[in-house]
Amino acid sequence: MKIKWPLQLWISLAVFVTIAVGTLLLLQPWQTIKTVTVQSTSIPSEKIERYAGIYPNTPSWKVTGQTQFIAQKIVKHDDKIDTAKVTQEGSHVTIDIAEKVTAGYIQKSKQWYVINRNGIQKKIEIPEGNAPVYTGFNNPADVKTVVSEFVKLELTLRQNISQINFSPNKDNANRLLIIMNDGNTVYATIGTFGKKISYYPGIAAQMPSKGVVDLQFGAYSYAYGTAQANGTKKKADNKAHQKQ
């Protein structure tokens, strides 16, 4: 006697098979991660891979649909990490790490504050000396603007900045006077600080002696003790060249 299966059973079986096949196609358990790219400032890539549990030849199904969870796991592993972002594109995984950065220190009413990468200030006893001291700032928004650009700089450049002083004059109401750890002095402008300070390493490398790097209008340098007229002439020449 031939058994006749109910229509509902066939429909349920078809749905189950469809879901199973769909899951297999989505997870592709036979696929593996081919490459892992880690973007971080100072934390070694090997550490980040270990925190994430992702390496070349890791099964793709361990990553697919779990990138947010993996990112949270990375942050919990290391106090130096501010945020993490994990992106999967086929067999390639990219992990972007934003490390916690001490953007500097500022003193107000004899109280010291540490400034984080978001410009938030927190009371401390005394600066640790691992980031620049901000002085002369009266507008908190100006501090945040400078901080937002400072934290984007290369680590070696950040480590070379000792002090960032708000030092306006009649020619530049937003002038910054920056003291470098290598012995040079930099003049810059709040609005263009982040973009122009990146030129500093190349300019400093060509200076025959310690001196001033002026990034307010163009970019030029002169040695300490050089007549200010020479510096002014160079600045004027630079402006004229830019207008050509």
From Swiss-Prot:
Subcellular location as annotated: Cell membrane
UniProt similarity note: Belongs to the FtsQ/DivIB family. DivIB subfamily.
Residue ranges constituting the POTRA domain according to the UniProt record: 28-104
Gene name tied to this protein: divIB
Stretches in topological domain Cytoplasmic: 1-6
InterPro entries the record matches: Cell_div_FtsQ/DivIB_C (IPR005548), DivIB (IPR026580), FtsQ_DivIB (IPR050487), POTRA (IPR034746)
Extracellular compartment segments: 28-244
GO cellular component terms listed in the entry, alphabetical order: cell division site; plasma membrane
Pfam families registered for this protein in UniProt: FtsQ_DivIB_C (PF03799)
UniProt entry keywords in alphabetical sequence: Cell cycle, Cell division, Cell membrane, Membrane, Transmembrane, Transmembrane helix
Segments traversing the membrane: 7-27
Function in brief: Cell division protein that may be involved in stabilizing or promoting the assembly of the division complex.
Protein name: Cell division protein DivIB
Coarse class of the protein's main subcellular location: membrane
Membrane topology designation: Single-pass type II membrane protein
Keyword Magnesium: no
GO biological process: FtsZ-dependent cytokinesis
